[in-house]
Amino acid sequence: MSDVVATIDPRRVSRYIIGGTGILLAVGVSVVSMTIGPSLGDTGLSLLSFLLREGFFIVLGLIAFGACYQISAPQLSRLTPLIFTVSVMALLAVSLIGSSVNGSQRWISIAGLTLQPSEIYKFAVCVALPWALMRYSASYHAGIIWLASLVGLGFIMLQPDLGTSIVVGLISVSIMWTWGLERRILGGALLVGLVGGLGSIAMMDYQRKRIIDIYFSSWCDPLGACYQVNQSRIGIGSGGLFGTGPAHARSLWGFLPNAHTDFIISVIGEMFGLVGVTLVVGLFAFLIYFCGQAAMQARDLPSRLIAIGGTVWIGAEALINIAQAVGIFPVTGIPLPLVSYGGTAMVVNLGILGLLANIAANQGLRRTGKLSLPRKSASAKSS
């Protein structure tokens, strides 16, 4: 396997990550722009205002992508404690002054912009956990560090936000597993996380009722708990092989709530059919594969840990979003990375992909602030 990895030019891996990111972003902008009409009444925005807001976050995300692509390992190391501290403080602020929507308190408003700190926390864990593990490498200290990262996860579960909690947990587990945490510690933490997740579901009436109705009940109210999933399935099914086309999609009539966020893949399935969904899934498989290649080619452990965490992050969110759209997984509010409309999520997704492209191009985070693309390694030449 290592011989196969060695034959792939790191610069090409980086270009593929950048290209896959750009194509998925373009798909998302196109589909969201066609879908947003029925949701404007809920947002209180005009179409122009909504598109300007979407454009603002995309531009901010592209700036984050560029900054993360150029950042060096020493620079990121200096910024990491600040990033983690700010993200935890923002989560605390949500519990005190956050805005509540549909029973969940996940957002804070700053200067007219609504931000979701739990999204920032994903990025913080992805860079802070590897940094802390390398700084305090003893296994005992590593366990304490992981428990400290779970403080933020606890805040997220109390919002409540089951989907983000799952993704943060998977990021942490993948990083700790790759680092080599003892299995008994890892198993104990997984058990605690599982109990906490089940307890969180039990505390959320709407989530508990939705899961019971969909998976354990012989009848599910088509106008209640099963409404979103049913409408999502109807949309995907009506798309057939090649889709109805944008002009005839039922999603434009407002039948499917949150079509531009949680259920964007259903809109793609209805408008462009199985062919469209397959292309989008293929693009994600392409992107995730080369993100994984970036991790495998990284020459230093911190870069590999960041790349593993970022790959699991994007892959888990894509899988959960698609699974919830077809009713395999409970609806948790996880957006489809780069494709769904999202402010904070868009920025941090582009940021972590910028880091992955950086790691791919340099076989690890670049050591200086200057752009330094590697030449073909000796092992690649000999193979």
What are these language model-derived features?
Residues 1-4, 319-383:
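A juxtamembrane structural motif centered on a specific transmembrane helix
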Residues 161-166, 244-249, 259-261, 278, ...:
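Transmembrane helix boundary and interhelical junction motifs in multipass membrane proteins
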Residues 8-21:
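N-terminal export and membrane-targeting signals
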Residues 18-34, 38-230, 266-324, 351-355, ...:
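Hydrophobic alpha-helical transmembrane segments of multi-pass inner membrane proteins, especially
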Residues 217-261, 272-276:
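TM-adjacent membrane-interface loops and short helices in multi-pass inner/ER membrane proteins
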Residues 1-10, 45:
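Cytosolic juxtamembrane amphipathic/interface segments immediately preceding
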Residues 111-121, 158-160, 240-245, 334-348:
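Glycine/serine-rich anion-binding loops at beta->alpha junctions
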